[in-house]
Amino acid sequence: MTQAPTASLTLTPVTSPAGGKDFASSVIYQVYPKSFYSSAGGAYGDLRGVIEKVPYIASLGVDMVWFNPFFASPQNDNGYDISDYYAINPDLGTMEDVEEMIAALAEHGVGVMFDMVLNHVSTEHEWFQRALAGEREYWDYFYIRPGKYAEDGQLREPTNWESKFGGSCWSRFGEYTDEHGTPLFYMHLYDRTQADVNWYNPTVRDELFKVVNFWYEKGVRGFRFDVINVIGKGEELL
């Protein structure tokens, strides 16, 4: 396996989400914004709805609120297909709403935890779109490999690995081929619209750390790293 590059976050260590408790003894309350509460009385929740309910949340005696993703996303996987880590799904609110929500919870002694998806990005993310447009440096942001030809001459995926959502975890990468004319594929361990990023690329790792630090600076004090267990791949197997 390729050795992982050395990199580090710049977060200041914290031992408790709020109230002096450690995480092991803290009460963490999950909020899926789309279904929590609508500030306009509509069918779907929004961040303004969460802000309105901060006193109620605090009254439950919770130490931290864990939010499912509300970043910009085409919503092919309920927000776990992120197209921009620095933007908010406009159906749910704005960056100003997020800042107000974090501040309101902090005033009530409640910390904030985000779901953070670093294993993959939406195929609508700028990185993947630039890769598709032919910017070769962005090819290294993902796992792009040539297919293989079987004895019968049929084109096969690079490996026989399956997606968690069914079928192969490889999809054609546009119309691109390698130097031998073999079609290229990109890896997606989940939906085909969720391209796995190359954790072993130092630039990618630094970009992901920038994301985490950005939200830490906004006041987020906890992160649940979704499917982080699959972020490293055995490159010798690809």
State where each predicted segment sits.
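A glycine-centered loop/beta-turn motif at secondary-structure junctions
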Residues: K218-G222
